[in-house]
Regions:
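Catalytic histidine-centered segment of alpha/beta-hydrolase-like enzymes
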Residues: 260-269
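Gly/Ala-rich beta-loop-alpha elbow adjacent to hydrolase catalytic centers
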Residues: 145-153
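Short beta-strand/loop motif that positions the catalytic acidic residue
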Residues: 221-223, 228-230, 234
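Hydrolase active-site cap/lid region
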Residues: 162-208
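Conserved alpha/beta-hydrolase "acid-adjacent" motif
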Residues: 235-241
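An N-terminal hydrophobic leader/cap segment in hydrolases
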Residues: 2-59
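Conserved alpha/beta-hydrolase
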Residues: 89, 96-118
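Alpha/beta-hydrolase active-site loop
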Residues: 121-141
Length: 279
């Protein structure tokens, strides 16, 4: 019943966008983009509060949006953690334990519209810009990004090459924004006029076309050591996204897991990440 209601709601959005496009394609693109970039969850829940409250850092203003940071001080190199869509810094708790055992200095933050951070929406470009400013502030040696966090990390490194960063880890990261948009179109069932209007909206506001956001494209110019981890049965982001990324990332290694899902927070994964950063 719940799936049926969700499907019905999704189709109603598509019908709404299609009807809007009959009168204004520009408005249809704007509304489709707003829906695509509005998270339904990812805020701090009571189960998250006790853990995160202890490690609250300062709130950083990025593009007029306050971003909540968290800090786990250590004597070693600094690691920046970037969570995925509809998540928050709590998702890193198991990895943080392993990083602390090796004395890494750990920084995380909640993306716009997520966790304790301000805002209501998030897209790859604004997330990458958030990463850039956090990198300038904390000067991490290593960055770990899960899902959308991995995509934003690579986008930022491509757009703003930073030689102080030595290693990058991506977990279940998507390859192409165009593929995410195609999935969105298939789910909601809006027509190609709306899709074209959405692409125009992205270009007008962020100076990018949808097809420009591509991790295989970004990887060609990234010199940092990379560790790419992806589960072959991932139902959120297909494994071949990381295969294509690895193919174009000269200095990367690809770990294929089986049956660990999209979240990839199991101990065996965390140990492989920590070993990679420590080597």
């Amino acid at each position: 019943m719940r799936k049926l209601l969700y499907r019905t709601l999704a189709l109603s959005y598509g019908a709404y966008f299609n009807s809007t496009a009959l009168f204004s394609e520009k408005e249809a693109g704007k509304r489709a983009f707003k829906t695509f970039t509005t998270p339904r969850k990812g805020r701090i829940l009571p189960v998250h509060q006790e853990y995160l409250q202890e490690y609250l850092g300062k709130k950083i203003l990025v593009n007029n949006t306050g971003l909540q940071t968290y800090e786990w001080p250590g004597t070693g190199e600094t690691v920046l953690l970037m969570h995925g869509w509809e998540s928050n810094a709590f998702r890193w708790r198991y990895l943080i334990e392993k990083l602390q055992e090796r004395e890494f200095n750990i920084v995380a933050f909640d993306a716009p519209g997520h966790g304790y951070s301000e805002g209501n929406r998030l897209n790859v470009v604004t997330y990458a810009d958030s990463a850039r400013q956090l990198i300038d502030l904390y000067r991490p040696k290593h960055i770990i990004g899960h899902s959308m966090g991995g995509l934003a990390t690579l986008h930022n490194q491509y757009q703003n090459p930073n030689t102080s960063i030595e290693k990058i880890v991506t977990l279940g990261a998507p390859a192409e924004l165009s593929e995410l948009m195609a999935h969105y179109q298939n789910l909601v069932r809006f027509n190609n006029k709306v899709l074209e209007a959405l692409d125009k909206h992205v270009y007008e506001h962020f100076n990018y076309r949808v097809h420009d956001i591509s991790t295989p494209k970004f990887a060609k110019s990234i010199a940092q050591q990379g560790l790419i981890i992806h589960d072959e049965w991932d139902t959120i982001t297909p494994f071949n996204a990381s295969e294509r990324l690895h193919q174009n990332w000269k200095n990367s290694s690809l770990i294929k897991t089986t049956g660990l899902g999209h979240s990839l927070h199991q101990e065996e994964i965390n140990l492989q990440i920590v070993d990679f950063l420590s080597s």
